[in-house]
């Protein structure tokens, strides 16, 4: 019997619209694939305080490289990089970091709220089988 191999991924989180929100969000997210489970851990600092954060990752289903959007993606020229404007370079919203990521239900109120210091921590084990079924 083959032993399950753990695979780790690391995402460096970079802020967008930092000059507008007047904070420099920072942290690294880790993703650990271990057998039938994906463990997601994200701890955020200096986010806008006391609000819910729709945290998720973006990507391309075909495996193309995703990039952090810049003001070049601000197609409506309002000075903000809006979520729909990110898709050309960052891909689509793939997996939400909410109360049930495997459900792939993006718009709802099940995301974390930052405390008064702009801190929050997300720690979740997600069944890979359920998550993979949403990508078929």
Task: Provide a role label for each language-model segment.
Residues 1-136:
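N-terminal leader/targeting pre-sequences
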């Amino acid at each position: 019997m083959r032993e399950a191999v753990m695979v780790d991924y690391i995402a460096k989180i970079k802020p967008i619209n930092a000059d507008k929100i007047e904070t420099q969000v920072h942290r690294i997210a880790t993703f650990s694939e271990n057998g039938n489970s994906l463990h997601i851990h994200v701890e955020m600092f200096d986010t806008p305080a006391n609000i819910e954060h729709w945290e998720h990752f973006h990507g391309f289903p075909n495996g193309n490289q995703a990039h952090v959007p810049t003001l070049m993606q601000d197609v409506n020229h309002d000075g903000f990089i809006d979520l729909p404007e990110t898709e050309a370079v960052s891909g689509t919203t793939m997996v939400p970091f909410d109360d049930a990521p495997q459900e792939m239900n993006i718009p709802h109120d099940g995301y974390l709220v930052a405390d008064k210091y702009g801190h929050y921590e997300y720690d979740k084990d997600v069944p890979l089988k359920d998550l993979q079924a949403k990508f078929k």
